[in-house]
Amino acid sequence: MKLTCVVIVAVLFLTAWTFVTADDSRYGLKNLFPKARHEMKNPEASKLNKRDECYPPGTFCGIKPGLCCSERCFPFVCLSLEF
């Protein structure tokens, strides 16, 4: 009986916490679709295509190839695609 009450209180608390911390989504889809449509018409307007910072060939990239401008990171050094 006590365990059931504890579980019910925990579920109610987590549900309330989810609603309190959630973003205001009333106009989320309304603003999302025109932006996506604009990005489909002009792919260069997409934020995903922009690179804020990338490393030139010969610099240390760790194990994340996405940091290199050429997308090639082999043994921890950015490689160039030019042959």
From Swiss-Prot:
Q: What is this protein called?
A: Delta-conotoxin-like Ac6.2
Q: Which Pfam families does the entry link to?
A: Conotoxin
Q: Which family does it belong to?
A: Belongs to the conotoxin O1 superfamily.
Q: Which residues form the propeptide?
A: 23-51
Q: Which residues form a coiled coil?
A: none
Q: What is known of its domains?
A: The presence of a 'disulfide through disulfide knot' structurally defines this protein as a knottin. The cysteine framework is VI/VII (C-C-CC-C-C).
Matching entries from InterPro entries are given as: Conotoxin, Conotoxin_d-typ_CS
Signal peptide start and end residues = 1-22
Arranged from A to Z, the UniProt key words for this protein are: Cleavage on pair of basic residues, Disulfide bond, Hydroxylation, Ion channel impairing toxin, Knottin, Neurotoxin, Secreted, Signal, Toxin, Voltage-gated sodium channel impairing toxin
Source organism, top-level taxon: Eukaryota
Q: In which tissues is it expressed?
A: Expressed by the venom duct.
- Disulfide linkages recorded for this protein, renumbered to the chain, are C54-C69, C61-C73, C68-C78
Q: Which GO terms describe its cellular component?
A: extracellular region
Q: Which GO terms describe its molecular function?
A: sodium channel inhibitor activity; toxin activity
Source organism: Conus achatinus
Intracellular or extracellular location(s): Secreted
Spell out which residues are annotated as carrying 4-hydroxyproline.
P57, P65
Has UniProt tagged this entry with the keyword RNA-binding?
no
Biological function: Delta-conotoxins bind to site 6 of voltage-gated sodium channels (Nav) and inhibit the inactivation process.
